[in-house]
Swiss-Prot record:
Sumoylated. Lys-117 is the main site of sumoylation. Sumoylation plays a role in partitioning TOP1 between nucleoli and nucleoplasm. Levels are dramatically increased on camptothecin (CPT) treatment. This is DNA topoisomerase 1. Its main location: nucleus. Residues 1-199 are annotated as: Disordered. Its EC number is 5.6.2.1. Specifically inhibited by camptothecin (CPT), a plant alkaloid with antitumor activity. The active site is at 723 (o-(3'-phospho-dna)-tyrosine intermediate). Endothelial cells. Changing residue 103 to R: Localizes in both nucleoplasm and nucleoli. Almost complete loss of sumoylation, concentrates in nucleoli and no clearing from nucleoli on CPT treatment.
Length: 765
């Protein structure tokens, strides 16, 4: 309580000075009238200051002021011992008020005493009411509130009651307290604490011991999925017409009709297979009466429906900030409740907690099932997966789950079977989760193991090109394509069930052309087929002579629609790969070749003397080489031409600014030669810096334009997220001083937190 004694001593000295001044007044009564008002003002200021310190001193000053007004100079003859007695009583009150006074003194600029550490029960209790804290917008009020009860438990009950009574008696204390808080600005303390909180939340699972083989988690609890909202019927003024006449549809039929109306301007609705599949499934939802009337899709008029949905879309765009904020808050509330799960005592983000709403299936490419109705998923379709000791999520009222499982050998939380392809859909964890991160890490470690034996495997398949067995030769040539061209293995599919996409094992004779010589190169194979997601793979590749001869042999006496590798399937190939190396698949080859290509390209393209924008361009070029290898293509964005025009406008404007700056520099240099003083030299230096700054800005814009042009038909993201060991990128960034934020966005940094933490600049794939 050393701070209290210092404060009390200063108060006693103030009282002594007050008494001395009154004695001085007795001797010089003529001066009293001149200075009386001035001294009253000073006394009031002292009284106000004392108010902000503690309530007891305020009462003392009030009593003094009352005495002054009543008796005039009666305080002149007060005994000093009486003052000291009052000070003693004051000290006793201060002790009784405990830490409340200490806190007030601290807030008013007094240094806190060392003994405060011995009284933690008071430290967090004396907090201003919510209405006083609210304007400060403290982000951790809730956390502090959670901590208070622990401190209150050790609080003396009598002291607590006394303090509350004192606060009620004197409401004025609250305002100075907040004023002082405003002066002190407590926010920086919160800002310092906040990063610590975030650090605590980061689970460095890669530093922990891994679970036994096959075990994915020990505890799992979640809230289940969020279902699509129920259908809202169209307003009465929005009509559907059949054969020129208004027709009122039943709710089920109307809902399916709206799916088509929403896509009315889309290319899909002009495709015959889409229209045929839609009409077939739509009729299943109609009543018998509707089926009898609606027999031809061409006679259906969805125009008013389509216009209604366009107007709704436009209205959403025109929403006020308040309306948008309200929707955002609702989404955040939903995310907070359903977007996280508890896995092994850690809060993990869920990737897709919302069930997809009903609609019309589109598919990729010319999918044979496009236009079919994706039915509404109900709770009765849902399988829940959680711990036995976890609280099972409650289904919506009036419904029940299909099944509740407790399988800790799988990573999904929720599953259901969709009706179009009969495939199983899952709700999984976010890519930044431990489970996803471990899977990625394991994938890249497997690819690194391939590096040790890839030469042996390559020698083996070269030997197999000469095998007496056709099956072995075909397998060896297919493996050569998977290795050299990063082709996917290609799965067998039922005809008519999916789009006609192929991989290496399912290539047909029609997909390749052989050229003994083409464009000055020998033994060229021309590939042309639809790969995954119906993306065209077109490539002209020079191959080794023995591969070329084998392909000629495989194509003998075959029709265009016949399989190129008729003695091979993915099962046979994958079994052979497992024999070569445990865990080896066609995807491991793709991952290995993608990562090793990135590492090699970065070494070749990165120049030590380049600035950051130039280094980023080098990185993107290395990434592009991988994307081309893996055939990660995309259609140029619709806004590409417009964005390039805007960028060129910026470049032209920057060039003009640079030309002006150079003229200014030249003029300043001429002045400096004539004037030869310090002021003109400073002007020259300033102009030089301006020119340098503009040159850097221009270079950044030009690099950006080059990058956009080169990447307009290449998808860099797919390889970056799925095939490139992130540790290669992290090591490159650390080695060349490139901020990791320039390569990975926030989501990607969360996904690759394990790589960012563990890789140093010397990492080699």
């Amino acid at each position: 309580m050393s701070g209290d004694h210092l404060h009390n001593d200063s108060q006693i000295e103030a009282d002594f000075r007050l008494n001395d001044s009154h004695k001085h007044k007795d001797k010089h009564k003529d001066r009293e009238h001149r200075h009386k008002e001035h001294k009253k003002e000073k006394d009031r200021e002292k009284s106000k200051h004392s108010n902000s310190e503690h309530k007891d001193s305020e009462k003392k000053h009030k009593e003094k002021e009352k005495t002054k007004h009543k008796d005039g100079s009666s305080e002149k003859h007060k005994d000093k011992h009486k003052d000291r007695d009052k000070e003693k009583r004051k000290e006793e009150k201060v002790r009784a008020s405990g830490d409340a006074k200490i806190k007030k003194e601290k807030e008013n600029g007094f240094s806190s005493p060392p003994q405060i550490k011995d009284e933690p029960e008071d430290d967090g209790y004396f907090v201003p009411p919510k209405e006083d804290i609210k304007p400060l917008k403290r982000p951790r009020d809730e956390d502090d509130a959670d901590y208070k009860p622990k401190k209150i438990k050790t609080e003396d009950t009598k002291k607590e009651k006394k303090r509350k009574l004192e606060e009620e008696e004197d409401g004025k204390l609250k305002k100075p307290k907040n004023k002082d808080k405003d002066k002190k600005v407590p926010e920086p303390d919160n800002k310092k604490k906040k990063p610590k909180k975030e650090e605590e939340q980061k689970w460095k699972w890669w530093e922990e011991e891994r679970y036994p083989e096959g075990i994915k988690w020990k505890f799992l609890e979640h809230k289940g999925p969020v279902f699509a909202p129920p259908y809202e019927p169209l307003p009465e003024n929005v009509k559907f017409y059949y054969d020129g006449k208004v027709m009122k549809l039943s709710p089920k039929a109307e809902e399916v009709a709206t799916f088509f109306a929403k896509m009315l301007d889309h290319e899909y609705t002009t495709k015959e297979i889409f229209r045929k599949n839609f009409f077939k499934d739509w009729r299943k939802e109609m009543t018998n009466e509707e089926k009898n009337i609606i027999t031809n899709l061409s006679k259906c008029d969805f125009t008013q429906m389509s216009q209604y949905f366009k107007a709704q879309t436009e209205a959403r765009k025109q929403m006020s900030k308040e309306e948008k904020l309200k929707i955002k808050e609702e989404n955040e509330k939903l995310l907070k409740e359903y977007g996280f799960c508890i896995m092994d005592n850690h809060k993990e983000r869920i990737a897709n907690f919302k069930i997809e709403p009903p609609g019309l299936f589109r598919g990729r490419g010319n999918h044979p099932k496009m236009g079919m109705l994706k039915r509404r998923i109900m709770p009765e379709d849902i399988i829940i997966n959680c711990s036995k000791d976890a609280k099972v999520p409650s289904p919506p009222p009036g419904h029940k789950w299909k099944e509740v499982r407790h399988d800790n050998k799988v990573t999904w939380l929720v599953s259901w079977t969709e009706n179009i392809q009969g495939s199983i859909k899952y709700i999984m964890l976010n890519p930044s989760s431990r489970i996803k991160g471990e899977k990625d890490w394991q994938k890249y470690e497997t690819a690194r193991r391939l590096k040790k034996c890839v030469d042996k495997i390559r020698n083996q398949y070269r030997e197999d090109w000469k095998s007496k067995e056709m099956k072995v030769r075909q397998r060896a040539v297919a493996l050569y394509f998977i290795d050299k061209l990063a082709l996917r293995a290609g799965n067998e599919k039922e005809e008519g069930e999916t789009a006609d996409t192929v991989g290496c094992c399912s290539l047909r004779v029609e997909h390749i052309n052989l050229h003994p010589e083409l464009d000055g190169q020998e033994y060229v194979v021309e590939f042309d087929f639809l790969g995954k997601d119906s993306i065209r793979y077109y490539n002209k590749v020079p191959v080794e002579k023995r591969v070329f001869k084998n392909l000629q042999l495989f194509m003998e006496n075959k029709q265009p629609e016949d399989d190129l590798f008729d003695r091979l399937n993915t099962g046979i190939l994958n079994k052979h790969l497992q024999d070569l190396m445990e865990g080896l698949t066609a995807k491991v080859f793709r991952t290995y070749n993608a990562s090793i290509t990135l590492q090699q390209q970065l070494k070749e393209l990165t120049a030590p003397d380049e600035n950051i924008p130039a280094k980023i361009l080098s990185y993107n070029r290395a990434n592009r080489a991988v994307a081309i290898l893996c055939n990660h293509q995309r259609a140029p964005p619709k806004t590409f031409e417009k964005s390039m025009m805007n960028l060129q406008t910026k470049i032209d404007a920057k060039k003009e600014q640079l030309a002006d700056a150079r003229r200014d520099l030249k003029s300043a240099k001429a002045d400096a030669k004539v004037m030869k003083d310090a002021k003109t030299k400073k002007v020259v230096e300033s102009k030089k810096k301006a020119v340098q700054r503009l040159e850097e800005q221009l270079m950044k814009l030009e690099v950006q334009a080059t990058d956009r042009e080169e990447n307009k038909q290449i998808a860099l993201g797919t390889s970056k997220l799925n095939y490139l060991d992130p540790r290669i990128t992290v090591a490159w960034c650390k080695k060349w001083g490139v901020p990791i934020e320039k390569i990975y966005n926030k989501t990607q940094r969360e996904k690759f937190a394990w790589a960012i933490d563990m890789a140093d600049e010397d990492y080699e794939f």
